[in-house]
Design a protein with these regions (language model features):
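Condensing-enzyme catalytic core mediating Claisen C-C bond formation in acyl metabolism
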Residues: 1-69, 73, 77, 159, ...
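A broad "ordered helical/assembly scaffold" signature
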Residues: 29-33, 64, 93, 99, ...
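Short helix-to-loop capping/linker segments positioned immediately adjacent to catalytic or ligand/cofactor-binding
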Residues: 67, 82-86
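Claisen-condensing/thiolase-fold acyl-transfer catalytic domains that form or cleave C-C bonds
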Residues: 72, 76, 83, 94-172
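Short, surface-exposed connector motifs at secondary-structure boundaries
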Residues: 87-92
Length: 172
């Protein structure tokens, strides 16, 4: 399996405003049972010291199919829970800004949520997986391209390290 990583960072500040902006709901989770599906063995304080010229490998263990299934299932479930708490349906969402890990994961999540791909902000092809920076970068691009309008209902979706996941619904 090949992983395409990019480099980037971003931050989003939330502040009080007189507009109709609203944070409807936010859901987070962590799966403690699939830890061995994605591991970096022999790293940090447990790392054996070796000469890097010996071709030392950190020992990443990645079960792609398990991670794929779990990411899709987790993001779809969290989206459903956040939308339910917000009192909204998926049809009322104007944009989805997901973590840009893998296009197949995003397509499968959209299909499972019955959400049109044309309403998803995708920039993975330009930057790769920028880890925690992917959502702020995609949001910035959506704002610059005028895809986010006042009162847009946005669903943010994430899945990542530690097999964590999150979904947040906002009125921009």
């Amino acid at each position: 399996s090949a992983v395409l990583f990019g480099d980037g960072a971003g931050a989003v500040l939330i502040e009080k405003t007189d507009s109709d902006s609203k944070l409807h709901a936010s859901k987070m989770t962590c799966d403690p049972f699939l830890g061995e599906a994605l591991m970096l063995k022999n790293f940090g304080t447990s790392m054996e010291l070796k000469d890097p010229r010996e071709g030392y490998f950190f020992g990443i263990s990645f079960e792609g199919q398990e991670i794929f299934k779990n990411a899709v299932k987790t993001m779809a479930r969290l989206a459903e829970e956040a939308l339910e708490e917000a009192g909204l349906s998926i049809d009322e969402i104007d944009l989805c800004i997901p973590h840009q890990a893998n296009l197949r994961i995003l397509e499968a999540t959209a299909k499972r949520c019955k959400f049109p791909m044309e309403k998803m902000i995708i920039n993975l092809d330009q930057y790769g997986n920028t880890s925690a920076g992917s959502i702020p970068i995609a949001l910035t691009e959506a704002l610059e391209q005028k895809k986010v309008k006042p009162n847009s209902k946005i669903l943010f979706l994430a899945f990542g390290g530690g097999l964590t996941g999150a979904a947040t619904v906002v009125d921009w």
